[in-house]
Amino acid sequence: MDRIIEKLDHGWWVVSHEQKLWLPKGELPYGEAANFDLVGQRALQIGEWQGEPVWLVQQQRRHDMGSVRQVIDLDVGLFQLAGRGVQLAEFYRSHKYCGYCGHEMYPSKTEWAMLCSHCRERYYPQIAPCIIVAIRRDDSILLAQHTRHRNGVHTVLAGFVEVGETLEQAVAREVMEESGIKVKNLRYVTSQPWPFPQSLMTAFMAEYDSGDIVIDPKELLEANWYRYDDLPLLPPPGTVARRLIEDTVAMCRAEYE
């Protein structure tokens, strides 16, 4: 699937190594390969954006390697492609040898997979399903500040789905573990690939059922009910968390204004 980059190849360039992204001038590179010293490198086309190819190059650059979070303000589609590139680069880097027999592996020519030439085992990129849920109580929404977000941002609750668990069960468990409350009338909204490091966020809205807020201090710094017209600092636009909050605010406005 990959090939040698030629002088006139052009498009968007996702140059990634160890979950980092090359961002010269803080931007995702766009243009001809020669402008970025990429001629002769191997590249894999991972999609298209506005009619232009998006290429993955597995390479470490000496300068300007940053987090894919730095391009979160890009259009959602381009951000997702950048995230795909970072995840694929890490997948190929971490699957050089077979986990079953220890022999060297090679990339498939027909799909995103690594193949073992010895035992014929086939590996695909790992995706970790997560739930994220906006909980409404009358004219208020439950927002929390997570221990990993010490920048004042308040967001909705989220967590990983466990083995043998449905998405609905994961919502109920995560909400209870993190906040101590029960929810009802769960409704699926949307999903979003989230490359930190390899999650697929499944987004829900729910209504408060019962219980008082009792936070898990390992997960949250604080959690509280916030009236829809008096909210704290929120996640940036383009994130599924922001989408859930805005949808909840719209519902509250429709009822209370």
From Swiss-Prot:
Residues at which Zn(2+) binds: C98, C101, C116, C119
Outcome of substituting E178Q: Abolished deNADding activity
Record's function text: mRNA decapping enzyme that specifically removes the nicotinamide adenine dinucleotide (NAD) cap from a subset of mRNAs by hydrolyzing the diphosphate linkage to produce nicotinamide mononucleotide (NMN) and 5' monophosphate mRNA. The NAD-cap is present at the 5'-end of some mRNAs and stabilizes RNA against 5'-processing. Has preference for mRNAs with a 5'-end purine. Catalyzes the hydrolysis of a broad range of dinucleotide pyrophosphates, but uniquely prefers the reduced form of NADH.
Binding locations of a divalent metal cation 1: A158, E178, E219
UniProt keyword terms in alphabetical order: Hydrolase, Magnesium, Manganese, Metal-binding, NAD, Zinc
InterPro entries noted in UniProt: NAD-cap_RNA_hydrolase_NudC (IPR050241), NudC-like_C (IPR049734), NUDIX_hydrolase-like_dom_sf (IPR015797), NUDIX_hydrolase_CS (IPR020084), NUDIX_hydrolase_dom (IPR000086), RNA_Hydrolase_NudC (IPR022925), Znr_NADH_PPase (IPR015376)
Cofactor(s) recorded in Swiss-Prot or TrEMBL: Mg(2+); Mn(2+); Zn(2+)
Top-rank EC class of the record's enzyme: hydrolase
Recorded superkingdom: Bacteria
This protein's name: NAD-capped RNA hydrolase NudC
Subunit organization: Homodimer.
Disulfide links within the chain: none
